[in-house]
Curated annotation (Swiss-Prot):
Residues 482-510 form a coiled coil. The gene is Sh3d21. Keywords: Coiled coil, SH3 domain. SUPFAM superfamilies: SH3-domain. InterPro entries: Endophilin_SH3RF, SH3-like_dom_sf, SH3_domain, SH3D21_SH3. Residues 65-126 form the SH3 domain. Residues 211-220 have a biased composition (Low complexity). It comes from Mus musculus. Residues 267-280, 332-342 have a biased composition (Basic and acidic residues). This is SH3 domain-containing protein 21. Residues 41-54, 343-365, 439-456 have a biased composition (Polar residues). It comes from the Eukaryota.
Amino acid sequence: MVQSELQLQPRAGRRADASNWGDFGSDKGGLGNTDIPPITPNSQRPPKLSNLTYDSPPDYLRTVSCPETCRVLFDYQPEAPDELALQKGDLVKVLRKTTEDKGWWEGECQGRRGVFPDNFVIPPPPIRKLIPRKIISRESAPIKETKKLMPKSSLPTVKKLAAAASAPGRAKTLSTPSGDSQKRPSRNSGFNGSCLNGGPRQPGRKGSRTQASQQHSASSQEDEQKSPGKGPSRSKTPTPEKTRLPDKVLAPETIPAPDKVSIPKDPVPKKAPDSDKIPATEDTTLDKAGTPESTLSGNKPAKDEALDLKMALHEDTAPALVKILTPEHMIFKKEPSRDNDQCQHLPQGGSTQRPESPAPSNNIQVPGEYSPPPDSSERSCCRVRQVNGSFPAQSKAEDVSAMEEANFLEEPLAKDERTLNKALPKKLPSERAGPQKQVLPQESAPTPQVPHTIQQMPVPEEAPTLHPLTPLTSPKSKNDRMDVLESLKEEVGLLRSRLELLELKLEQKMGDVWEELKTETLLSPEVQMMQRNRKSFKHAETQTETQTE
């Protein structure tokens, strides 16, 4: 109120001076006649000029068709009859903002009209006027963005149409856009193919390499069939690749492949000088074992023939060899591949050095064709034990592979008895290398020095002594195989029991989680209802408190 009174006093004095200004001039009369004419126009013109300059620039001060409503801040008591009385909180309609005096507006309040000072009133907030402008700007912004984006996407089509329509030459103009259109999709397709189809192209290249390697191996095997003397030297490169892959992947099909290829190569130069009939039989075994398309089912007869030769030729070496092979294969997996490589490198030295190879290495003591069955069975044992020790969770795939190998080993046992009577009368009288193989393990087992036995190699007179001793060796090898199969079955049973326990635990955990989810879903609406009830209760309490006050 003190500020309003201070502001009112100078304004009231000014309006009084302005209203009484003519009386003072008339009182002076003729005393100031010379001064009056220049003073009166100057005193009248400045307010006109000030009104013109004051009215023209701002638009909000002009009269508007829709009158504004202002709220009164301070009480105002009129001092002149044309002034309007104001009370705090009243609403005043502004009729005009241009009046004779600066800072005075004309308005209407409670059915009365008059002039009032503008600083006693608050105009409506300008935010209300700006709200529609902001909404329009927000709506127009995405429209502009879409307009900007559309021409970019349609630029290539527009350029093609313009190039096709504007060019006067018929043949030339038609050739250029078609050439561009043919070039562009090729570039795009190449680019997209390199970016998007980068993944599937790489396996294609790898597949082509593997096909080339398979073709190379097949061609090398055909060359071996044509020239048996040069066979071992050419087969050095494909066999280490085949032996490295099974060590990493542990696939049952690829493991016996190098053994099958290397088995018939060792006896080829040994048996070639003795008779001409034997290489023909060996070529048939090469065809069976060397083809890259052979599967496990196709390789069973080759293994059976190998087992028949072993059963016929060796008396006491079979159980010893099995005992020697088992610990090394259980500990080291990569030794058979290295030993097979040694078998392939050794034949270059000559036929006299070949009997020396069985003495230092245990895997090479197997004369040619007996190695694949213990390798496959014992490697499966290694896999099963590794699964028990380190990774019990990875079980289903390996159980299936172990069972397949077990079934695979059981089938040759039944076939061995049938094929013994057929294989022995054909090969034993013709092959004279049998006693040579029998002499080697008997003398090389106690002493590794074999040069004394090399002179005894060409003696072919001990062949008939093998016939009565063959049934003695077969039950031992069968018993060993049955022991291996029983151990495999026991390990598979243990794995299955562990898997069943894991399944039970997982089912229990899943059941617990499912029950927790159900309880949460049941509790969530109850919690929401409780929260709503609390809010409504608090709201009712606040209402009652306000009513009591």
